[in-house]
Amino acid sequence: MHVDHVAFGWDDLDLVRAALDVVGLPFDEGGAHTDGTTHMALTGFPDGSYLEYIAPTPGTDPEAAGFWPAALAGRAGPAAWCVRVDDVVAETKRAIDAGFAVEGPLHGGRDRPDGRRVEWDQTFERVDAPDSWLFPFPIVDRTPRSWRVSETDGVTALSGVDTVVLGVADLDGAAGLFDRRYRIPAPVPIETDAVDGEVADVPGAPIALTEVGESRLAQVGERPVAVLLGTDDLSAARTAYDLTDPVAWGARRVAWFDHDVFRGRVGVVE
């Protein structure tokens, strides 16, 4: 399972840009998606993964956004996640064979600020509700991937997306779904004060599960609740960026980007 990117949804992209400036995380402008309802910026990392900051275009109601309207309207932060695959049709068939509903493959695209159009194919997989984003969506580029993302100038002390933390109603139930779809190993509980609920890490996979409350589930459903960026030197990362004091994440340590937009949603793990 190779994380391509994590989408971070908000109702105003200018607010996210300002927060990125405050914490010192550089970003590139990405342009508007081809349906015209959302636009984005992104931070590309050395391992090829990236964070996508997505919001409604000016004049578009968040509820009318073509991507993840509930997350954008609710300022959920992490809204969905994506994995890179070699064959989106074959990956779609695997989801169907495992008994899950799919939407796709779908042709997607966006127009960069320099006028270049980026194109890809993706499939959205549903678990048990139309607004469920528990599973990642697979993606394959039609245009060169370097058109879609490249490493952002100024990124330092970060390797890329390390862990996608998924907010779920029940740890065992979610683990069973991932076993059925991806044949992952059994999640292992870890000790941490970084999030409110119980947390279980999946050995060898870039995911962790945490139980979230009914109010969040009612608002945005099961989907990513946080994303942790990898570093091999947390002290260097804390020098480069405005981060909170670190806390335990099992045997590792995690610190959040210290801004209301990102705290508890985007962090760095060593």
Identify the function of each model-found stretch.
Residues 1-3, 8-28, 45-270:
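Glyoxalase I/VOC metalloenzyme domain signal
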Residues 29-34:
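Conserved catalytic-core motifs of GNAT/GCN5-like acyltransferases
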Residues 36-48:
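N-terminal low-complexity or amphipathic/hydrophobic leaders
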